Amino acid sequence: RAGAIAYVMRSAGTDSHRNPHTGITRFDEGLKPIPSAALSLPDADQLARLVALGPVKVAIDLDCGWNGEYTSQNVIGEITGRSKPDEVVVIGGHLDSWDQGTGAIDDAAGVGITMAAGHLIGQRRDKPLRTIRVIAFANEERGLFGGKAYAAAHANEVAKHQIVSESDFGAGRIYSFNTNAPASAKPAV
């Protein structure tokens, strides 16, 4: 809208390595897409130091494109609860990865952790009280589409979901826990 010919942003990630966490770029309806890129934190810091010294010219060389949309699917496994089968506990990770990653940490580790947890729960002699649903969500990186599709498909059962948890970046130290639970539910979380 203001006439920019390109856009560069500081990485959305928090790691200090040279791989920027690029996220996704969207443009409002009717706006012409422009080249956009994320800089790693060290590179963004260097650019900020240079900008502080005076005007800076940046050349952008991107090798990317749009190949259209594709259909993907959530993968869902379920262990039926023994005494409260209508109450559901969801654990999961997501199947896709961002463009600079191998997918090992984000999020094959999360899928592996939750699949292993589901397997261990399924091996127990005493089955869980509630139904355990293990989900490998599709298309998280482009806008949480797998999670949104699951929510839409189960909208009439939302009150039966006791808790939903996703393991993302599951192979390192746990550095945060986030919840959208209402304040009244936070003591249970």
Ranges and model annotations:
Residues 5, 114, 131-133:
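A fold-wide structural signal in alpha/beta-hydrolase
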Residues 10, 92-94, 135-137, 167:
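Generic beta-strand/beta-sheet core signal
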Residues 34-46, 51, 84-86, 99, ...:
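Metal-dependent peptidase/peptidase-like ectodomains
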Residues 104-111, 182-186:
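Short, conserved loop/turn and helix-capping segments at secondary-structure boundaries
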Residues 108-116, 145, 149:
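Short amphipathic alpha-helical face segments that pack within enzyme cores
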